Amino acid sequence: MGGNVEAAKLVKKVTPAYPTIAQTAHITGTVVLRAVIAKDGRVQELRYVSGPALLMASAMQAVREWRYQPTELNGEPVEVDTTIQVVYSLG
């Protein structure tokens, strides 16, 4: 498949809440998610891949609200699969 592909650009990022139980237990790390970015730039088909289980729900909730400038192929919006990393750290 040839042509000019323009990658999706994040235009709205919602910071995930850090669950109190995870903070108290000093749990940090990166939650890795797989997503399909729809033609309109919305996140859809979000799946958990890896990372601390206590952080998964808050990461997924925040990422569902993210918005992207749609990916374009030859000037037309297309769906795209992507990997998203949400990093949690204390201090």
Predicted regions mapped to residue ranges:
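Acidic, low-complexity proline/glycine/alanine-rich linker and hinge segments
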Residues: 1-24, 61-64
